[in-house]
């Protein structure tokens, strides 16, 4: 009887845990997804300056690359698609129901989303709710038409009371009476546009309608929330509950303590970009490989036991080549990704990121610069089934080197980065990839014995012939065709 009772209690505890996990909106459990940030700063512009190195990323341009994107990525993060044209990158858009932007027309955007969906790739909308651009003066706004979700025209009463528009003499609402303003900001101020008062029912209804419209009308699958330092996390939870996105990621460029606070405010109904993990990757550049260890100060959400909520990255549109706009946050010493040195740094960081827990987000300039190598690492991650909650079984760092063993759904990997020499294949493993300057990164793989038709095959094989069919990557090797998990297809 006692054993039965213990068994029942254990079952109930597991069931409760599973229910709690299921209730985390926008946080897929044990998520195997790999994400692509499909833009960089000003990459909508015609080829000039930096843009000529990495290519333009308007909707029309990305449409030409959907086959390669579908093969390698599960989620693609788009820039803000709200318009109208003339709003640049889009982080101070003026009319959210207008999806004609500097990135392209609404029709091309819809065509691109449909093309990615055909390859089972999900699309992440960049959602800016903290602030918005104005219409003709500092304090009026375009009307948004969200179809069955409603029509909304915000006013100066929906602007935060302490916004600079009320204290700048050039503003049309300078010195407005408090009764004609919103409440005080619930987060940090952004002085580039009007900060919206999320305690306001009008702002809440507008935000919920926009989120629902993006998913159900525009057919996005999830959200990347911009500037979430600017409003309390309870409101983000409210908007996610209204829309129910597949995945939600908060941009919270701050300390681990502040990120943990945000997750608590949202009741863990979002993920966050792991900025502290990004900073730990600089150890590869400066030779301090110990920074990659979990027990180090800057190792991010994994150190806090929150890897499930981490979206890891090396660089993004704000940290890469912003002309000093955000200080010295770029991963590589320069933006010259044709440099052998920078390539070596990025590929080591990619090998680390793509073999570790969290949901890895590959930056577009890195992908287009080192497509073959990064695609190869992605395929290894997918073959082993590394996921957002994968256990790091062991890790060790020494002078100029780091290695770790990670458990996936279908196998284990050992990743080594740095100055290893005369490496021998660990017992029970096979070499999956070796690359970089003098083997600066190496991955070994050991597949679980069940369910794998040919566990000895290294994929993707440099000897095999890769081809794409119905948006999926296959490799012909000898007499057989294999998928990226090593299973014999024919």
Predicted regions and their residues:
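Bacterial N-terminal signal peptides
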Residues: 7-16
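Short, glycine-anchored, charge-dense loop/turn motifs used at functional sites
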Residues: 482-487
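Residue-level detector of functionally pivotal "anchor" positions at catalytic/ligand-binding pockets or at interdomain
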Residues: 448-473
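Alpha-helical scaffold elements lining the catalytic groove of polysaccharide deacetylases
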Residues: 195-210
């Amino acid at each position: 009887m006692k054993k039965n009772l213990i068994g029942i209690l254990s079952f109930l505890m597991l069931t409760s845990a599973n229910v709690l996990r299921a209730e985390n909106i926008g946080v897929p459990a044990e998520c195997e997804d790999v994400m692509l940030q499909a833009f960089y700063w000003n990459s909508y512009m015609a080829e000039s300056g930096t843009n000529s190195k990495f290519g333009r990323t308007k909707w029309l341009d990305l449409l030409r690359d959907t086959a390669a994107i579908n093969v390698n990525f599960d989620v693609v993060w788009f820039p803000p698609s709200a318009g109208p044209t003339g709003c640049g990158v889009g982080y101070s858009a003026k009319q959210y129901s207008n999806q004609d932007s500097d990135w392209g027309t609404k029709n091309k955007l819809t065509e691109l989303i449909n093309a990615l969906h055909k390859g089972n790739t999900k699309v992440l909308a960049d959602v800016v709710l903290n602030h918005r651009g104005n219409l003709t003066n500092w304090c009026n706004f375009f009307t948004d038409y969200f179809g069955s979700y409603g029509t909304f025209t915000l006013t100066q009463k929906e602007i935060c009371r302490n916004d600079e528009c009320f204290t700048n003499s050039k503003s049309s609402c300078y010195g407005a009476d408090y009764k004609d303003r919103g409440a005080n900001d619930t987060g940090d101020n952004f002085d580039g546009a009007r900060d919206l008062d999320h305690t306001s029912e009008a702002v809440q209804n507008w935000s919920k309608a926009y989120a629902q419209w993006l998913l159900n009308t525009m057919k996005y699958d999830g959200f990347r929330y911009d500037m979430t330092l600017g409003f309390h996390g309870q409101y983000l939870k409210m908007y996610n509950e209204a829309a129910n996105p597949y995945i939600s990621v908060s941009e919270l460029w701050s300390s681990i303590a502040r990120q943990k606070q945000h997750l608590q405010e949202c009741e863990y109904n979002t993920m966050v970009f792991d900025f502290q993990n990004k900073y730990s990757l600089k150890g590869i550049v400066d030779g301090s490989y110990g920074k990659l260890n979990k027990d180090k100060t800057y190792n991010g959400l994994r150190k806090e036991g929150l890897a499930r909520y981490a979206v890891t990255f090396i660089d993004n549109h704000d940290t890469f080549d912003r002309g000093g706009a955000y200080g010295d946050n770029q991963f590589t010493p320069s933006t010259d990704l044709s440099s052998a040195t920078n390539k070596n740094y990025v590929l080591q960081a990619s090998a680390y990121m793509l073999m570790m827990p969290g949901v890895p987000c590959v930056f577009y300039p890195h992908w287009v610069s080192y497509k073959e190598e990064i695609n190869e690492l992605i395929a290894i991650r997918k073959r082993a089934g590394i996921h957002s909650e994968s256990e790091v079984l062991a890790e060790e760092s020494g002078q100029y080197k780091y290695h770790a063993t990670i458990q996936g759904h279908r196998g284990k990997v050992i990743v080594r980065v740095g100055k290893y020499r005369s490496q021998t294949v660990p017992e029970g493993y096979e070499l999956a990839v070796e690359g970089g300057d003098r083997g600066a990164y190496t991955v070994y793989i050991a597949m679980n014995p069940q369910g794998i038709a040919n566990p000895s095959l290294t994929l993707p094989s440099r000897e095999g012939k890769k081809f794409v069919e119905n948006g999926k990557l296959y490799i012909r090797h000898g007499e057989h065709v294999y998928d990226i998990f090593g299973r014999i297809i024919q």
